[in-house]
A protein has these predicted regions:
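Extended alpha-helical regions
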Residues: 86-88, 94-102, 108, 192-211
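Terminal domain-start segments
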Residues: 22-100
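Structural signature of eukaryotic scaffold interfaces centered on beta-propeller domains
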Residues: 91-103, 163-172
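Short, hydrophobic/aromatic-rich segments at coil-to-beta transitions
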Residues: 77-78, 105-110, 174-177
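Mid-length scaffold segments of soluble, non-membrane domains
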Residues: 105-140
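Bacterial Sec-dependent N-terminal signal peptides
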Residues: 1-26
């Protein structure tokens, strides 16, 4: 009897069915998202999107404001959602999370909400899978971090007055990339900083302690 039980445990742990459960983890987190994260979508909307994506269909639904929201990417650990024409949402389950663990308390993920009006600016947050927010461990770069030392002072001050920074999560690893947005500058100012800005890449690490 013990051998049968051990065999069952082994088969469950390493079977394709178990791997499928692991792959579904990020979709389950998304399905349970609170209204503050996806205010335009009902839970049924999100479940429909997941079903469409998993059946290789366009995952677009009509949202509460009669606009359209589309789940663009859904993989084992990452998803990307176009919530509206002006809002893009990314979610990434961190690799130090244990997908096979029966306890969601050990799992952590990062979410990036990017709002464009029209230039994009992002908000970065960390959660456990019960949607308890975690302390912020990702440092939002300052404008000066993106600029070379010889950037014109007037351009530097203009960027500091309205610091618009876009963040993007990597689908392939636990990194986040920050890009300084310069579209609010004049054409002449943008010419002055050509080749004088850089992207900033950070590793995403979440603490277990809740806020």
């Amino acid at each position: 009897m013990k051998r049968i039980l051990l065999l069952f445990i082994y088969l469950f742990t390493f079977s394709p069915f178990h791997l499928l459960m692991a792959q579904e983890r990020i979709r389950d987190i998304y399905a349970a998202a609170p209204d503050s994260i996806c205010p335009l979508l009902t839970k049924n909307n999100r479940l429909d999107q997941i079903d469409f994506r998993e059946n290789n269909m366009k995952a677009e639904v009509k949202n509460k404001f009669d606009g359209h929201s589309e789940l663009l990417v859904l993989s084992e650990r990452y998803l990307q959602l176009r919530l509206s024409d002006h809002c893009l949402v990314e979610m990434k389950l961190l690799s130090d999370s244990t997908l096979a663990s029966p306890s969601d308390a050990d799992l952590r993920f990062c979410i990036v909400q990017t709002y464009s009006a029209p230039a994009p600016d992002s908000r970065v947050r960390l959660f456990d899978t019960a949607w308890h927010e975690l302390p912020q461990t990702i440092n939002r770069p300052s404008v000066d971090d993106f600029l070379s030392e010889d950037v014109d002072i007037d351009v530097r001050l203009a960027l500091q007055a309205l610091p618009l920074i876009k963040a993007s999560l990597s689908e392939n690893d636990d990194t986040i990339t920050f890009e300084l947005q310069t579209s609010e500058l004049t054409r002449e100012q943008r010419k002055l900083i050509e080749g004088k800005t850089r992207q900033i890449v950070q590793k995403v690490i979440a603490e277990e302690k809740r806020l």
